[in-house]
């Protein structure tokens, strides 16, 4: 598949007459078309929401474009929560997923009405003492071991610092329910920047089966399942991009096979994509200052590493 820039050299030459380099430029049309396709891909699920991963591109103007398509914000720090508040996000439009979390960030997230996604079993006691247990609460699951798709190892969750073990998750839900929680979410992130249409459906199957088991063992009402991020983009011109419509239908198929027969056809699906939502539609415009020809070719520009996003 041939990949072409969304802006021509001639257009850039005109733009730099007004805006000095370095700067980022974005394809608004591309962002909107992709957001529309994501919404279409999961239209079969009435409760679906994409929570854009703010860390991927913390630009309020761009996030507001996504909000026009029903997107919320996925935050992992107080700064990201503050940005979300500043652009008008509130309540369950905000998902707060963090680890090694300072107590004051839980307090601030709760003040905004955000859904809190706990990363650690010990955080149950922490938030209970800080803010009490919210009616809606989510927990992050780490299955451990290796995560494979079609016999290909995608990642090693067992080496990751994130999430509850299965045993901790079941016990945690029991404790949270006893302390007043009424609506529960399950979240998991098992691989980064996957370029395959099978990642979300494979992850969904794991989480859907887990949700059924948890419901049967705890009686908890599973309100949503959050597939998090991990849907990637090709970085080379000849790479094949993910087909979000095929991905959405793959998740739909597993949903109908696992959740619906178990009386869980009301579970909402959430995602937290960042790179997939914004990565292909932005570029860094920089000017070459020097070219050095030694054992390798070196190009010196007026940009630096801190300006490179995603």
Residue ranges of predicted features:
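Non-cysteine beta-strand/loop elements that form the S-adenosyl-L-methionine
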Residues: 76-79, 97-100, 136-152, 183-188, ...
